[in-house]
Structures are given as structure tokens and as C-alpha cells.
Amino acid sequence: METATLVAIFISGLLVSFTGYALYTAFGQPSQQLRDPFEEHGD
């Protein structure tokens, strides 16, 4: 394959991996450890 194709595939893979990790952190198992500042500020 050409170098440009490999670089494009690598960058696309990184982007998909980062997006998947961000979604997992936001909605998956670790999300229960996140604090909610709106819940803490009850006025």
C-alpha cells in the first residue's frame, strides 16, 4: 500500500478508538464514578 493510505487508515483508527473510549467513559462502567456538579449544587 502507499504511505498516504496507511497514514489515513492509522489516523482514522486512532479517531475511532478515541471516540469509542470517550463514549465508554461517558456512558459505560466508569461513568458511575463521575461527579455531577449540578447534583452537588442543589439550590
From Swiss-Prot:
Intracellular or extracellular location(s): Plastid, Chloroplast thylakoid membrane
Predominant cellular place of this UniProt entry's protein: plastid
Naturally occurring in which organism (per UniProt): Nicotiana tabacum (Common tobacco)
Family matches, as InterPro entries: PSII_PsbN
Membrane topology value: Single-pass membrane protein
CC annotations in GO: chloroplast thylakoid membrane
Pfam families to which the protein is assigned, alphabetical: PsbN
One GO biological process term: photosynthesis
Coiled coil: none
Family of this protein: Belongs to the PsbN family.
Induction: Expressed in leaves; transcribed from the opposite strand from the psbB-psbT-psbH-petB-petD operon, it is found in the antisense region between psbT and psbH.
Keywords assigned: Chloroplast, Membrane, Plastid, Thylakoid, Transmembrane, Transmembrane helix
Gene inactivation effect: When grown photoautotrophically on soil is highly light-sensitive with extremely slow growth and pigment deficiency; on sucrose-containing medium under low-light grows like wild-type. Strongly impaired photosynthesis; both PSI and PSII levels are decreased.
Protein name: Photosystem biogenesis factor 1
